[in-house]
């Protein structure tokens, strides 16, 4: 990523790529498409997927791994959240019905709860032990939730929606579940535009928001003051990912490029070109300083 040189291209010929995620052990790359999830080996020369997860009936809009990489989760336009064995290409092991197209899914650091957002404006907490929805929030009725992020220490949840607003809640301290949400802020991050991604930094000091207004904004989580506006993309900015030390941010845009930003200066230090269409997702492998884009 630091050199800005493409050293490998993986073909995903069945559909567009909606989301990318690298496993915690940095060995596999998961690509969410329509309607499957394909698994590639990161450090092998094999250009073909080694596994394909089938079961969704629509676009897969969200994917992720639990911290040990044993299982995966996904969300889809088909209105379901599913769990998968990450190492076997079998059908899903568990399914939750959301009653609306699922747009985003995040795993609580306790590993026992998933938070999903949908096109009808609902946020649901799925208790994996109880195997049921334990809590439901509706920040704005009928306004699609585009992105949900949970702090690495479990202290905060942020949700961004289609009116450009981010909602911030504090989670009950020392709670084993996230059933208690304390509203903290209603942030007009990108007024009259879409918040396409909101992401809490690994050190829980900053919030990144990407938008249809072509910008990325960095906010201080202590008071939610605006720290930086990152400008350079010429079309919608769909996705972002922090480096593990929160010093850098990678972004993906419809302008066909991805960018690497220095968060302290707000400068783009690398621009990655090569895609012939919109770049809508990105993932970062900090152990090798590699970025994946799709």
Language model regions located:
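WD40-repeat beta-propellers
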Residues: 1, 37-42, 81-85, 123-126, ...
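A structural motif specific to WD40 beta-propellers
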Residues: 5-8, 48-51, 91-94, 134-135, ...
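WD40/WD-repeat beta-propeller blade N-cap
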Residues: 11-17, 54-60, 96-102, 138-145, ...
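Residue-level detector of Asp-centered blade-edge/turn motifs that repeat once per structural unit
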Residues: 24-25, 67-68, 109-110, 152-153, ...
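Conserved strand-to-loop turn within each blade of WD40 beta-propeller repeats
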Residues: 32-34, 75-78, 117-120, 160-163, ...
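Core solenoid repeat modules with strong leucine/isoleucine-rich periodicity
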Residues: 98-101, 107-109, 114, 119, ...
